[in-house]
Amino acid sequence: MKKLLSATLLGAALLAGTAQAQDETVRLAVDIPYEPMEYRLPSGELTGFDIELGNALCAEIGIDCEWVVQGWDGIIPGLLSRKYDAIMSSMTINDQRRQQVLFSDPYFTPPSAWFVPASSDIRTPAKETLEGKSIGVQRGTLQDNYATDMYGDVANVKRYSTAGDMVLDMESDRLDIVFLDFPVGKSTLLDSEEGNYKVVGGMITEPKKYFGDGFGIAFRQRDEDLAQQFNDALATLKENGTYDEIFEKYFGNKKQ
């Protein structure tokens, strides 16, 4: 009886140890490339603002990050089917997504912007100006929703898997204008080697129905404890200056 009890206790301890070891690694899903937020270096290493901030958050919590590359179209279904534990991939917090996932506190709030070739005669993204034009957006993003609702009846809204694919079509004159998160458009268009692009119109953050409340980390709705650990770690990184260091590396000025 004692041997049986000891074996049972040993088995339980081993199972507990296995569960604890699994809990020490959090799998974070990311869709690449979306420079400067998430992309690969020539070496194949993942980097970007989300990647570095995510690694810093995991270090603060005391766990390891395992990054899982996942296409945007399937990124929420993959979370719900437990392919990974959370999504940290420039995902905008909005009411529609809140019905499916639990968001962390916002960690970044970028504006959106319209980008055209420097030689373009488009001066404003007014609806009448874009009538008959081809608009590029990344499929399934807030920019996709906004452009479809606001311009879909007068313009050809073309959807792409990545921002890089949009750039290729822009360079080949298959697009007249693209609508992106400003940091991504700045990195892929304004700061590119060609650099023959410009922004038309101002920075866009409204209406909240489309542009939400900033970027958040998405969790399964029942994973409140895990979300709180990331919220606490984010607050600590903002207090101790780590967040500002990462922000300045990618965006060049201190987050206010």
Language-model-derived ranges and their functions:
Residues 22-90, 99, 240:
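Extracytoplasmic small-molecule ligand-binding "clamshell" domains
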Residues 32-35, 46-59, 113-163, 182-184:
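Bilobed "Venus flytrap"/periplasmic-binding protein-like clamshell domains
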Residues 32, 109-116, 193-231, 251-256:
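Periplasmic-binding protein-like
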Residues 74-77, 89-99, 146-149, 176-211:
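A ligand-binding cleft/hinge motif common to bilobed small-molecule-binding domains
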Residues 15-21:
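Sec/Tat signal peptide C-region and signal peptidase I cleavage site
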Residues 52-60, 120, 133-134, 139-141, ...:
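Extended ligand-binding regions for polar small-molecule ligands
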Residues 64, 142-158, 197-199, 229-256:
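Ligand-binding clefts/hinges and TM-proximal coupling segments of bilobed small-molecule sensing domains
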Residues 56-60, 68-69, 73-85, 100-102, ...:
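Short helices/loops that flank or line small-molecule/ion binding pockets
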